[in-house]
Regions:
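Short amphipathic alpha-helix that is part of the acyltransferase structural core
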Residues: 1-33, 38, 49-53
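A short beta-turn/loop motif at secondary-structure boundaries
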Residues: 35-40, 131-133
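Conserved beta-strand in the GNAT
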Residues: 47, 53-62, 66-74
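A conserved beta-turn-beta hairpin within the catalytic core of GNAT-like acetyltransferases
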Residues: 62-70, 80, 100-104, 132-137
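Conserved acetyl-CoA-binding loop-helix of GNAT-fold acetyltransferases
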Residues: 75, 81-94
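Acidic/histidine-enriched, beta-strand-rich ligand/metal-binding domains
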Residues: 78-80, 102, 109, 113-117
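Conserved GNAT acetyl-CoA-binding A-motif
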Residues: 89, 96-110
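Conserved catalytic-core motifs of GNAT/GCN5-like acyltransferases
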Residues: 107, 119, 124-140
Length: 146
């Protein structure tokens, strides 16, 4: 089940999963992983629950802007390769569309190894630039949802 994380308990579970994936597995510094956008009123945190366990998270930021961003997409290691990420991204798109009630332009900063995954969901590169974020190669991608 995909839902918006609202309670402090749910948000803390989401932050813990992100810390596990990004900080522990990918060695991203904690001060880069958790940031001020996590507590912005224009951020929506999304969770994927399986048997009441949070196994996937993402966040929608800049919900007050013309272009919103999906980021901090993390899936528990034990559940990767099972289509959870695909369902989570589609869920994020649906939630964004439901909240904003208009055409939605979504941009994201994809880790280079996830580019094919996002391409399969209809995202395209914005440019040819590959850049480092937290010492991991990324590319900018975009999708318009009518």
């Amino acid at each position: 089940m995909i839902k918006i994380l609202k309670s402090k308990e749910e948000l803390n579970l989401g932050f813990a999963l992100r810390t596990k994936v990004f900080v522990e597995e990918q060695n991203v510094p904690i001060e880069l992983e958790l940031d001020e956008k996590d507590h912005s009123e224009n951020t929506v945190h999304i969770g994927y629950f399986y048997d009441d366990k949070l196994i996937g998270v993402a966040r929608l930021i800049d919900m007050d802007k013309d272009i919103i961003h999906i980021g901090r997409v993390a899936i528990d290691k034990d559940y990767r390769g099972k289509g959870i990420g695909r369902e989570l991204i589609i869920g994020c798109e649906t939630i964004a569309k439901d909240i904003l009630k208009r055409e939605v332009i979504i941009e994201l900063s994809a880790q280079i190894q996830a580019e094919k995954f996002y391409k399969s969901l209809g995202y395209n590169r914005v440019n040819d630039r590959i850049y480092l974020d937290a010492r991991i190669e990324h590319v900018d991608m975009k999708k318009v949802i009518d």
